A protein has these predicted regions:
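Juxtamembrane transmembrane-helix termini in multi-pass membrane transport proteins
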Residues: 1-65, 122-139
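Hydrophobic alpha-helical transmembrane segments in multi-pass integral membrane proteins
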Residues: 47-50, 111-121, 180-196
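Residue-level signature of transmembrane alpha-helical cores of multipass secondary-active transporters
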Residues: 1, 5, 38, 106-110, ...
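Selective transmembrane alpha-helices of multi-pass membrane proteins
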Residues: 59-88, 147-150, 154, 162-196
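Membrane helix-loop-helix hairpins that form the core translocation module of multi-pass transporters
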Residues: 29-102, 157, 187
Length: 196
């Protein structure tokens, strides 16, 4: 359970790239609400899938289509915002609060993130033991802790990266690369879902 949770949480994805970029631009402290929202949002998604939502998806598979489309739109929007970011690194100057990702955006991003749904459905299938819900409760608890720590590590990495990117146009170039990557990841996940 720990290895599965770690491999899914620490591997690059839309949420991780958003945390990396936000922490580079605004610091971990400013990004912490987004990290918390993403962790709690995913934990609620995982618990919902573990304890019944999976059956609803089996009955109404079109729900995954809707989630994939909405998720792609959300990820494209976030990617465009990162792409257009000025490329400033952490400073003592006041931040533009409107550009710092919020708790709600973190939670919503997980519910609309195809990678999160894949992790939730795969983990539920892997660790489900029939009618013994205690195993799934342990899985959800382990995933919560591992997810929080993994996302926090991405935030710390972004903050550390800021010192390297504080020269010339490196921060702006980094935002362009991260924005383009997030856009490409979201389009690729949508493409793979509909045309695999």
């Amino acid at each position: 359970m720990f290895i599965f949770s770690l491999s899914m949480s620490i591997s690059p994805g839309p949420v991780n790239l958003t945390i990396l970029t936000s922490s580079m631009n605004y610091g971990v402290k400013a990004t912490f609400a987004f990290i918390s929202g993403a962790t709690i949002g995913f934990t609620l998604l995982l618990a919902s899938v573990c304890f019944g939502l999976y059956q609803m998806i089996v009955i109404y598979p079109v729900l995954l289509d809707v989630i994939t489309i909405l998720g792609t739109v959300l990820l494209l929007w976030i990617g465009l915002n990162i792409l257009r970011a000025k490329g400033t690194v952490i400073s003592s100057q006041p931040h533009d609060e409107a550009k710092i990702p919020t708790f709600i955006q973190g939670a919503l991003m997980q519910w609309l993130n195809p990678k999160a749904w894949i992790a939730a459905v795969a983990g539920t299938g892997l660790f489900s033991t029939g009618h013994i819900h205690a195993v799934l409760l342990v899985f959800v608890a382990i995933y919560f802790v591992v997810c929080y720590l993994s996302l926090l590590l991405w935030g710390i990495a972004g903050e550390k990266l800021a010192s390297f990117l504080n020269t010339g146009n490196r921060a702006r170039l980094f935002n362009i690369v991260m924005g383009v990557l997030l856009i490409l990841i979201s389009l690729e996940m949508c493409w793979r879902y509909f045309y695999h």
